[in-house]
C-alpha cells in the first residue's frame, strides 16, 4: 500500500471514529509520513477517550478523576446511576475465543452488560440489575454458577468467578473491583475446591489473608518449631481445610 492510499485510509478511519471529515495536502513523502503519524495518534487518543470499555477499565483502577466521571459517562451514553453487579472471571489458562463467544452469548451488549477484558486469563462483567429479585444473593450466586457451568461444559475450561454487592453508581466500581479481586484471591487460596466466591462469604480466610507475613511465620514457628514442614500430610491438610470451612 503506497503512502497516498494509507493516508486516505487513515482519514476514512478517523471519520468513522469521530465523524470529522478532513483534507490533508501533503506534497512530499516526509509530509505524508508525518501526517499519517498525526492521524494515527489522533484516532488512538479519541478511541481512548471515548471508548466505553477503556472508560470502565479506568474506573475500576481509579484512573479517572471523580469530577470527570459523570461527564465522560454522559458522552459515552452510560447511565452513571444504575444498579449493577460486577462479576470477575478467571480461567486456568487464557481467555480464548471460545470462552469470549460464550460470555458474549450469555451477556449480549443489548442487555446493557459490559464485558471488560483485564488480563490474558481474566475479565470482568458489569451486569445491570433490572429488579429487586435480580439483586438477591440467591439470583446473583446462580448467575455466577451459570457462568462457571456453561464455560466448563461448552469450552471444557475451568473457571472461577467472584461477584460484588450491588453498586448503584459508577463511582463505586473501583470498590466493587477491589472486593471481587480479594474474593478471588482468598477463594483460590483457602477454598480451592470451590469455583464461586461471593464478596461477603470469605469466612476466616479474609482475616488470615490480611495478616502480615511475619505474623504468620511466627505462628508457624510456635507450632512447628524451627523446622516448618514444606508440605502437610493428607490427614493434616483435611483437618486444616475443615477448620477453615467452619471458620475456626
Task: List PLM regions with ranges.
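Non-catalytic regulatory/interaction regions at protein termini and inter-domain linkers
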Residues: 1-26
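Gly/Thr-rich phosphate-binding loop signature of adenosyl cofactor/nucleotide-binding cores
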Residues: 61-62
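Generic hydrophobic, helix-prone segments enriched in Leu/Val/Ile
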Residues: 14, 56-57, 190
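Charged, amphipathic alpha-helical oligomerization/scaffolding segments
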Residues: 6, 13, 31-34, 179
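Cytosolic nucleotide-utilizing catalytic cores of signal-transduction proteins
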Residues: 6, 66-86, 90-95, 102-248
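Short, charged amphipathic alpha-helical surface segments
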Residues: 21, 25-58
Amino acid at each position: 500500500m503506497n503512502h497516498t492510499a494509507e493516508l486516505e485510509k487513515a482519514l476514512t478511519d478517523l471519520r468513522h471514529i469521530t465523524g470529522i471529515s478532513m483534507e490533508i495536502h501533503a506534497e512530499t513523502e516526509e509530509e505524508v509520513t508525518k501526517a499519517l503519524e498525526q492521524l494515527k495518534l489522533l484516532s488512538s487518543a479519541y478511541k481512548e477517550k471515548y471508548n466505553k470499555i477503556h472508560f470502565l477499565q479506568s474506573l475500576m483502577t481509579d484512573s479517572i478523576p471523580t469530577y470527570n466521571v459523570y461527564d465522560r459517562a454522559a458522552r459515552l451514553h452510560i447511565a452513571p446511576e444504575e444498579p449493577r453487579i460486577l462479576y470477575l472471571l478467571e480461567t486456568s489458562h487464557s481467555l480464548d475465543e471460545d470462552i469470549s463467544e460464550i460470555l458474549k452469548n450469555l451477556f449480549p451488549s443489548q442487555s446493557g452488560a459490559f464485558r471488560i477484558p483485564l488480563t490474558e486469563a481474566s475479565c470482568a462483567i458489569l451486569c445491570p440489575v433490572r429488579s429487586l429479585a435480580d439483586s438477591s444473593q440467591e439470583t446473583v450466586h446462580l448467575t455466577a454458577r451459570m457462568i462457571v457451568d456453561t464455560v466448563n461444559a461448552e469450552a471444557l475450561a475451568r473457571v472461577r468467578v467472584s461477584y460484588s454487592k450491588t453498586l448503584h453508581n459508577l463511582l463505586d466500581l473501583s470498590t466493587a473491583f477491589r472486593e471481587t479481586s480479594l474474593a478471588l484471591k482468598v477463594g483460590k487460596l483457602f477454598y480451592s475446591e470451590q469455583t464461586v466466591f461471593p464478596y461477603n462469604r470469605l469466612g476466616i480466610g479474609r482475616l488470615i489473608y490480611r495478616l502480615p507475613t511475619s505474623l504468620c511465620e511466627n505462628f508457624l514457628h510456635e507450632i512447628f518449631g524451627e523446622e516448618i514442614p514444606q508440605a502437610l500430610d493428607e490427614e493434616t491438610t483435611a483437618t486444616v481445610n475443615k477448620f477453615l470451612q467452619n471458620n475456626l
